[in-house]
Curated annotation (Swiss-Prot):
Family the UniProt entry places it in: Belongs to the CLU family.
Gene: clu1
Basic and acidic residues: compositionally biased ranges: 662-682
Domain Clu: 375-619
InterPro entries assigned: CLU-central, CLU_dom, CLU_N, CLU_prot, GSKIP_dom_sf, TPR-like_helical_dom_sf, TPR_rpt
Chain positions of TPR repeats: 1033-1066, 1075-1108, 1117-1150
Region spans: Disordered: 662-692, 931-960, 1245-1266, 1281-1310
Organism: Aspergillus fumigatus (strain ATCC MYA-4609 / CBS 101355 / FGSC A1100 / Af293) (Neosartorya fumigata)
Top-level lineage group: Eukaryota
Keyword Cytoplasm listed: yes
The protein's assembly and partners: May associate with the eukaryotic translation initiation factor 3 (eIF-3) complex.
Protein's recorded name: Clustered mitochondria protein homolog
Amino acid sequence: MAIWSTRKVGLDNLRISQLLNFRGFDPSALVTKLTDPFSLQRLLTLNQSRSPPMVNRLKDSRKRRAAVVCRIRDTRDGWFSSLSSLTSSVIGLFQISVKLPHEPYKIQVMVSSQEQVQDVRQSIVELPSTFQYTCFHLEFNGKRINDFVELSEVEGLKADSEIVLVEDPYTEKEARMHVVRFRDLVGAAGDRSDNLHGLNAGLSLHDAVTAEAATDDVKEHSLSKYDIAASPSLETILPRAEAPLPKTVKSISLSAWNPPPYHLRQKGHLLYLQVTTNEGEQFQITSHVSGFYVNKCSNHKFDPLPRTTPKKVSAHSLLTLISKLSPSFNSAFEALQESNNKKDLLTTFPFQNAIPNSPWLVTPPSSNPNSHQADITRSQESYLVSGVDNAETLRDWNEEFQTTRELPRETVQDRVFRERLTSKLFADYNEAAARGAVLVARGEVAPLNPTEERDAQIFVYNNIFYSFGADGVGTFVSEGGDEAARVAVGKDVLGIKAVNQLDINGLFTPGTVVVDYLGKRIVGQSIVPGIFKQREPGEHQIDYGGVEGKDVVATHPDFVSVFEKMSKALRIKKHPVWDKEGKRHDLEGSVETKGLLGTDGRKYVLDLYRVTPLDVVWQEEPGSEDYPHRMSVLRLELVEAYWRSKMSQYVKAEVERRRAAKAQEDAANKEQPSETTESKEGESEEKAEEALDQERVDISGFQLALNPDVCSGQVPQTEEEKKQWAEDEKEVRDACEFLRSKVIPELIQDLHDGDVGFPMDGRSLSQLLHKRGINIRYLGKLAQLSKEKGSRLEALTTLLVQEMIARAFKHIANRYLRNVPAPFVASCVAHLLNCLLGADVNPKPSAEIDASLREIYPEGDFSFEKVTPETLRAEVEKQVTVRYRYTLETEWFSSLRHLQLLRDIAIKLGLQLGARDYAFTKAQLPAKVPVANGVNGASHDESKKKKKKGGDSKSPSRAVVEEKPVVSIVPDDIVNVVPLVKDASPRSSLAEEALEAGRISLMQNQKQLGQELILESLSLHEQIYGILHPEVAKLYHQLSMLYYQTDEKEAAVELARKAVIVTERTLGVDSADTILAYLNLSLFEHASGNTKTALVYIKHAMDLWKIIYGSNHPDSITTMNNAAVMLQHLKQYSDSRKWFEASLAVCESLFGKQSINTATILFQLAQALALDQDSKGAVGKMRDAYNIFLNQLGPNDRNTKEAETWLEQLTQNAVSIAKHAKDIQARRLRRINMNPRVTTLGTKVQPQVGQTAPEASGAKGAANASMDSRSIDELLKFIEGGDATSSRSKQKKRAAASNPKLRGSKKSSA
């Protein structure tokens, strides 16, 4: 298939996970190269002396894995047995030779028998020694090998066989691809302008952060001067300045003589190129079917024949040709490769199956005026990639989707191929659809129905059908108009994604993407055959479901079976509906869900926005009449949770019933005489075991499904129908009440108790709610419940209110942006942000608009100019009240967290802002905003300068200069707007099955088997999703945890590092997941002995935390504790103490001063103070911890006893130090001639005190006896009167006991 001519991601990853199990290798060395397309070849081919042992170890590994799989078959069936066939099939690794036409003339390649020949081709293309080959085929025994057959199908091919690489004649397409690849290889490609991917898309900061760890001062650590309370620095999330890469050629582009004239095309001329070398020489090059050669053309004379003087230069590859023309090329190219090799491969690896994340904050263009360089080829790339008419990229998306769904899925190999192809196809479609949607939003695509209203217009671009997510034709008039239509298309994507995940045989869905851009919501769908077909009179346009709203309903017997499967999986109840004439129609799904029989004979399901019932209780609440639409449906996660809850009740009732029946049976048996033979006893034991097995209840008798059409206008006709409809409605109401009375309160309680990770920003909050099945419209209810919990959930309340404000602002901004001409988008956004965030700087901001430019848009909507801070606040309050049924506090705008709110808004609108220190309050103005005018001196100098310069002629220019700081955000700060894409891509069920099987095995203490299965899941994830994908990042994280728990720390570090990079590039450099990835990496680095590196990662994570949340996040308590423990490990006791104190301050503010969590940190802080030679402070903190444990847990609790023991030891030690200090002071008073300055030096006293502890045992014992007779209070009084100097002899023993209190701080660390 043509689709598979795309670039393959790395090598066969199944081989990689096989190699991870070699017992003769350091696993971390292999894990570091998981994604390096060349490393595996180097490992297996370049070191010839080690190859045979590798193969032997692989055979041993195969035998061991085969035995494991046999055990699986004995205990389980289904997926596990399928996995065994996969394992045995991919295990056939062997080495072959490839004969080359040029140096090095032969290479060795390790291959798998299940690989396709094209995979071997790709491996060759990516090897450094064979970069120059792109247009070739492979031969074996003199016969050409088909690129799309597996190596096992090549007759006679075995280990140590030799295949031959034969260079092919070029076609125009191959020549263009060769030029594109050459530009990428030699670093001449430059930056590509892209309307889909924003600036710095796919950015990773990992290498820069790691470099900081490598350059840190040996004597200091990264937290030595860190200020926990300092304001966040935006530099944290910006890319670091890098040295320019070595330049290999000055330029390479298509020549002005291109394309070749007709008569020369007949002679094999394909392209004409122009190359300027580093030496400044310019060469005109002809791309010929035979290769490339220097021709006789100049800028003014056309002569494309080969140049013979000074010498004839030609080659099959451009790489070889340029190396002959430019003496410096080879050295520059090697330097470029070395420079690239210094970076982690993952940071530069191209995206294959995911859209890279575009950061919300970017380096402003003004900071680097030379960032945009002249490159004529940039404008030629579309031709180089797609050809003259762009026809090479036109694809029949719908046919590809449906053909892929029809691929066989019987074996695991079939499923791997099918899911791999599906993932790639969805990624390609999502990107193509998003690009087209941007053009539609910008008005650059002509509509098919230009006479219709704008919202009703439809478009076709790149074989994708586009429409607006608005009610252009009045379909949703009764549901809320444009608001309802906008919600419906979003729900439609979720419904299609759910059906795609079910993968029902015979049921097809169109490729669907929803794109939000510049206030518009655009739907892109693959064109279903027959959807535009004009039916015969009397025929419906739709074959199943509602045709024209709900007035006309169609049914078709062919759809019953496939819709039945879909509805059963989605918990949808089969139910009747009635058309406008009262005629009953029994449907398997909602009346809104439609079935279309395409002209290709396939059954398509459309409009899946009502796969779950309406939230009836929400719609009946006070305030529902003001809600913008009636599309408030329950989430699929909620329906599933409700089903599990009901099933659990069913199972419990069934078990109780069985046990009651069993009890009656046993009672009856006791009344009858029983035999006491051994055989009877054996039978009774067997029956007891059977009884235990029978506790497993058969749930096939449990049925629960919800009717999605209740409370949506259906009118039952008969009494029986009304009764059934009432029962359906009751079930739906129960599900709604389940959400309100159980799910939401449970989430609040889990957050209160610390049983779930605390959200950090709006995105992580939304993910948490959706995972629990809670709709975003319940933010207000969550905020009310959170506020009732008091200070413990104050952070959650703040986050919920901020999210409501951000979403309200998003709706307002979208309304204004929808009809704003493109050149004024930045002005509109900047003005609205100033009204929301910068009112303290300027209470009456005005929009910055070019009046002359405005005149050419007479129909543009410039109503945003009239917005003031007061009107915007009122509108935000109204939106929050209407959408979330929550009333903001009177002065809510005075307590905004400006930076965090700005970030949330930017992410929700797709904004990319220029990085600078934004001033949102007057207090920030003197320090930050006046930098623009270059007079950043002290304010008291201003009047003097005015007097010196004072002329009236200067004042106007001065006013202009100072006008920019008057507002917080100017239009130039809005650097770019990127589209937000919602897709329907399914997850890989095969990879998830392998992962789940591995988890089950680990839970059953089958460690080896569990590891094997999780490694298989890793290889499947990498194959199906590609390396750069959020799902792969999650698995890297889980696998790193697994390796850490099994004490394979180096491998854990490497996988955690990969998790960081992939998370940064796919989810964002400052996402909540990135912070967690850095924190995990820091723990693994510390466990591996790299504590200073770990502290660098913690510092970076804390800086990110400040940006996305602010200070005092509940989960930061654990992080600060970890940092303190790491600092203790480095013997940085003073710094460690500061971090424990900071952790204590946050803990006391969240949990109160008398909580167990606070006592736990007090316990640790007391130990830290003792290590820092502050015995008096240590005693005080340990006493506080002891009192809390005593009050909360009682005197017999282990925590209380241990705190008491430590308190006694610290008290006695402090007393001895205080007494010793007094003795020294008395001796010093007797030495009048002693220099008083020396008495203050404690460095000479400390060793003495430390030495007296073990030496003066007799006297010490007496002293201890006397001290023990006094109470701790009396001892503390004695200490208070003594010298503050303290030290103790037993500090080294503290290290082992520094962490045991963590076992009592489950809640504080959650």
